[in-house]
């Protein structure tokens, strides 16, 4: 009887932990969807923050300023900085991004942060 209670407790624990792991993975996946990585390029030039993918939704109200990526990047990009300091890459040719640019001020570069 004691072994069956232990086994049931173990299976309940595994089920709870498994569901938590799935939830965490789903949250991280959702975060990557809205905040694609910004990768710092170069060894000598420390001012080149580049975008390799773009966020699909740009909520302008969340951002306080922006700056363009450097000319040494493969893809052009606009990096928006949120109130929390999060960096979000956006496509500069997107109409929604252009609207955001008209309402926000251009700010300083990111300070050489590496976001992966």
From Swiss-Prot:
It is found in: Secreted. One of its GO terms (biological process) is immune response. GO terms for molecular function: chemokine activity. Induction: Associated with stimuli that promote myeloid differentiation. SUPFAM superfamilies: Interleukin 8-like chemokines. Keywords: Chemotaxis, Cytokine, Disulfide bond, Secreted, Signal. The N-terminal is proteolytically cleaved by proteases associated with inflammatory responses. The processed forms CL6(22-95) and CCL6(23-95) show increase in CCR1-mediated signaling and chemotaxis assays in vitro. GO terms for cellular component: extracellular space. This is C-C motif chemokine 6.
